[in-house]
Amino acid sequence: MSRKSIAEKQVAKPDPIYRNRLVNMLVNRILKNGKKSLAYRILYKAMKNIKQKTKKNPLFVLRQAVRKVTPNVTVKARRIDGSTYQVPLEIKSTQGKALAIRWLLGASRKRSGQNMAFKLSYELIDAARDNGIAIRKKEETHKMAEANRAFAHFR
């Protein structure tokens, strides 16, 4: 058995304007090549756009979008006796939230549009309204897990 101590999970720090951890998690996923100020600028423009379009608190829309995209289960490929099975697994809320953020950003990058701030804002608005590419991804994952429920005992 290892004598090394287990590293403690780091808690995400809140961002300077909204004082919210979720916003900071999103900024860290937008981040490319260490350009954090650009990532903040993209997100804050997206939040401003959300406020103009929906006339609601952008933080509320963001939370709602992440909550609706967060998956409960996921599938993991397990190789047993030479054949690969997609085994459904329940995931923790933190991991689900991280997946939701990743899916939202992936979906907004795929969107056609002017710039990342607009694409992100429209994807967040769509996700909060229960449609959009990220919501489809979640439903697809849940369907996959449901279809492979027979392999759940291979955990």
UniProtKB/Swiss-Prot annotation:
GO molecular function, one term: structural constituent of ribosome
SUPFAM superfamilies per the UniProt record, alphabetical: Ribosomal protein S7
UniProt main location, coarse: plastid
Subcellular location: Plastid, Chloroplast
GO terms (BP aspect): translation
GO cellular component, as recorded: chloroplast; small ribosomal subunit
Xref: PANTHER family: RIBOSOMAL PROTEIN S7
NCBIfam families cross-referenced by the UniProt entry: rpsG_bact
Described purpose of this protein according to its UniProt entry: One of the primary rRNA binding proteins, it binds directly to 16S rRNA where it nucleates assembly of the head domain of the 30S subunit.
Name recorded for this polypeptide: Small ribosomal subunit protein uS7c
Native species: Marchantia polymorpha
